């Protein structure tokens, strides 16, 4: 992703991935900090004119990639893997009304194969 763009379509695709990852990591961080933070207000939910921007929905009401990053992490139960500086950690946030049983499968993926 961090290479030179190969044209307009490639640029749009990679900017979409960046928006998705930005929203996903932001929401996962907020879910992990649930004791200290209980809400979030989005500044740019939608675009007010056709443009490339940091909103979640475009001018025509079509969801952008960031919308799907939000949708995935706004589920009642959300699991994420993060680096706390000492190693990788798994955090599970349960915002449902009760207890839930869960199973997690973790795979380490290289660019060319699963390790």
How would you name each of these model-derived features?
Residues 1-115:
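Carbohydrate-binding surfaces of carbohydrate-active enzymes
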